[in-house]
């Protein structure tokens, strides 16, 4: 008996499938639509591929998770209950890769470091 192929995205019985956002499809927490809007409003390029906002949202989510993980570990080690801007600044400057990435970034409420 031949198998019937289901159409991609259909939920059967001729009905439409549930719509699924690009953020959900990519399994991200950061909104792909928000990233795309920021890219378009910033006029960074004349054209924008469909995958560029997805990729950038994934990179931003990864960097945020990494910084928060390091700051959370540092907060636990120092006996603090909250992640403060000072902890974020310290974590970014103590990590070699993050330090080179954010070397020109100023974190609000933190005095500039003396190098």
UniProtKB/Swiss-Prot annotation:
Signal peptide: none annotated. One of its GO terms (molecular function) is protein heterodimerization activity. InterPro entries: Histone-fold, Histone_H2A. Its main location: nucleus. Present in mature sperm. One of its GO terms (biological process) is mRNA processing. The keyword DNA-binding applies. PANTHER family: HISTONE H2A. The docking domain is responsible for the weaker heterodimerization with H2B. This is Histone H2A-Bbd type 2/3. It comes from Homo sapiens. The gene is H2AB2.
């Amino acid at each position: 008996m031949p198998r019937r192929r289901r159409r991609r995205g259909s939920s059967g019985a001729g009905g439409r499938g549930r719509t699924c956002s690009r953020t959900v499809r990519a399994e991200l927490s950061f909104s792909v639509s928000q990233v795309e809007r920021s890219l378009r409003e910033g006029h960074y390029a004349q054209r924008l591929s469909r995958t560029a906002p997805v990729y950038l949202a994934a990179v931003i989510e990864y960097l945020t998770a990494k910084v928060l993980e390091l700051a959370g570990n540092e907060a636990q080690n120092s006996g603090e209950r909250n992640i403060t801007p000072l902890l974020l600044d310290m974590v970014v400057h103590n990590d070699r890769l993050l330090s080179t990435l954010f070397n020109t970034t100023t974190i609000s409420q933190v005095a500039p470091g003396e190098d």
